[in-house]
């Protein structure tokens, strides 16, 4: 069995005889995956996480980091984290338009500056998702440098 992952060419593979799943970069015990548009799509990523929640494997083997035992609660927490991050973005946009770089500063105040690029791309993936849902709109172009506001 396979499911798509954080990028279109990343997959998860089940090993039923070992009650295990090779989760690749999709689910890692030490970090969340960075969903990078245009190849990475937040809707696809969330759907894949939901699919994993319906599966029964008791151990995940990520590409990076230690194995993850009893992964289902962790996968549910990953979904909750992504949904909360999108709520955080919507909260920022309630008052005024924002650029992604400014959102990174606000949402990740203690993040090492070397990781701001990854955080920006993750926020951009969330923005594209929210834009597809009709929740937000671009005031300029839909890019990493664009200006975004809550849809009117």
Question: Model-found features: residue ranges?
Answer:
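C-terminal regulatory/interaction regions
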Residues: 91-152
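Extracellular interaction modules
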Residues: 1-2
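Metallo-beta-lactamase
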Residues: 5-88
């Amino acid at each position: 069995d396979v499911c798509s992952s954080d990028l279109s060419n990343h997959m998860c593979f089940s090993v039923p005889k070992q009650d295990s799943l090779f989760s690749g970069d999709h689910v890692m015990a030490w970090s969340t995956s960075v969903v990078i548009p245009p190849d990475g799509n937040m809707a696809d990523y969330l759907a894949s996480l939901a699919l994993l929640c319906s599966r029964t494997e008791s151990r995940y083997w990520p590409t990076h980091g230690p194995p993850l035992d009893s992964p289902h609660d962790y996968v549910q927490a990953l979904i909750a984290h992504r949904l909360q991050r999108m709520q955080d973005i919507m909260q920022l946009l309630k008052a005024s338009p924002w650029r992604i770089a400014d959102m990174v500063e606000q949402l990740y105040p203690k993040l090492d500056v070397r990781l701001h690029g990854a955080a920006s791309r993750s926020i951009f993936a969330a923005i594209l998702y929210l834009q597809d849902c009709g929740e937000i709109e671009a005031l300029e172009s839909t890019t990493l440098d664009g200006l975004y506001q809550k849809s009117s």
